[in-house]
Amino acid sequence: MTLPSRRFLLAGAGALAGCSILPKGNPPPQLFRLTVAPPASASGPALKGQLLVDTPFAPSALDTDRIALTRSATSFDYFGGVAWSDRAPLMVQSLLIESLELSGRTPAVARESLALRADWALKTDLLHFEARYGAPGAGAEASPEVRISFSAKLVRMADRIVIGQHMANAVQRASRNEVPAIVDAFDEANHQIIQEIIAWVVATGSSATR
């Protein structure tokens, strides 16, 4: 169903069966999740040692399972009736860890919450994770652009020094102004971001150990 141009609101829930006196409620949201980034070429150096991946820091507007959208630089909203399968930072952390494992270039990777002894820690800030409406010249029903933005830091745990910092940005236009197509655009943009971060982590860590 094409999304309305104004804020997305749930339609009223259907009547309860029979003569129940329970109040009517909204149906649970439809859940969506993103997929693991396909591994790029495994050629080149691998990161030596254990890598811990911290939960990305995110502003409160993004630290939620709601799927975010913007219509201007100063507005923030969410799609109605749908949600991510987990809070966005936790979902991204899980995808980043799985993608690192599948890459073949980071043989030892885990969540930082496990408090394992490690050689490296990856700290990230989730700066943008939203669908953007209102591009110049776009009509009210035009499909949005998905924007994902990360700031990443690689910490050498032996001396707790940040050995590198990287900004990763991806923009992907949805093929249609419908939630499944918008989620597909999130998926593609997230793949680009994760593959870029993996390549940067391996290159930065490998250079620091030479």
In which residue ranges do the predicted regions lie?
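Short secondary-structure boundary motifs at beta->alpha junctions and helix caps
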Residues: 77-83, 158-199
